[in-house]
């Protein structure tokens, strides 16, 4: 089975939904952020602080390039990975890209106590700008799911329904 890539802003539920979806489809779950943390031996926030965002984005690109040649994966991408046009096109060539679309208010509410999100340390106006910029690429996904006010299980069922229709 071809891969399923979950994209969306941080806090949209990609990892939570991805694990449930992979289990339902009997596919392997891959979390790009976790892969990077394992390979680098440090947390994402530490990579950002010590090596910078551009270094981290390059690590993301390398991971997605390594994965696209495999099959049978449900992949949780980092929020910035799916917002990169080249990465989006690469993922669409070899699978279904599912955008978990949530409002900025939902993101802020879900992540208000999360200290491990470097981008959330920026002023709210900067976060809003980033949110809007990323949506321009997320919109190119094959499937869009409104993930506001839904449980992870409800989101998974909606993804399964939409994938079956394709």
From Swiss-Prot:
Binding, ATP: 11-16, 117
Pfam families: SKI
Binding site residues for Mg(2+): 15
GO biological process: amino acid biosynthetic process; aromatic amino acid family biosynthetic process; chorismate biosynthetic process
Cellular location(s): Cytoplasm
Binding site for substrate: 33, 57, 79, 134
Catalyses which reaction(s): shikimate + ATP = 3-phosphoshikimate + ADP + H(+)
Gene Ontology MF terms: ATP binding; magnesium ion binding; shikimate kinase activity
Superkingdom of source: Bacteria
InterPro entries: P-loop_NTPase, Shikimate/glucono_kinase, Shikimate_kinase/TSH1, Shikimate_kinase_CS
Keywords: Amino-acid biosynthesis, Aromatic amino acid biosynthesis, ATP-binding, Cytoplasm, Kinase, Magnesium, Metal-binding, Nucleotide-binding, Transferase
Family indicated by similarity: Belongs to the shikimate kinase family.
Subunit structure and binding partners: Monomer.
Protein name, UniProt field: Shikimate kinase
Source organism (scientific name): Sulfurihydrogenibium sp. (strain YO3AOP1)
Name of the gene this protein is made from: aroK
């Amino acid at each position: 089975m071809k891969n399923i890539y979950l994209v969306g802003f941080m806090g949209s539920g990609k990892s939570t939904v991805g694990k449930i979806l992979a289990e339902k489809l009997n596919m392997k779950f891959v979390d790009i952020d976790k892969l990077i943390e394992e390979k680098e031996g440090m947390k994402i926030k530490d990579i950002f602080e010590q090596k910078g965002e551009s270094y981290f984005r390059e690590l993301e690109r390398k991971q997605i390039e390594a994965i696209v040649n495999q099959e049978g994966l449900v992949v949780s991408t980092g929020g910035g990975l799916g917002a990169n046009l080249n990465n989006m096109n690469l993922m669409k060539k070899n699978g279904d890209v599912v955008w978990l679309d949530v409002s900025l208010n939902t993101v802020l509410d879900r992540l208000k106590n999360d200290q491990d999100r470097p981008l959330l340390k920026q002023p709210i106006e900067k976060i809003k700008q980033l949110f809007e910029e990323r949506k321009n690429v997320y919109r190119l996904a094959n499937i869009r799911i409104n993930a506001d006010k839904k449980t992870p299980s409800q989101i998974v069922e909606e993804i399964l329904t939409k994938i079956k229709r394709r």
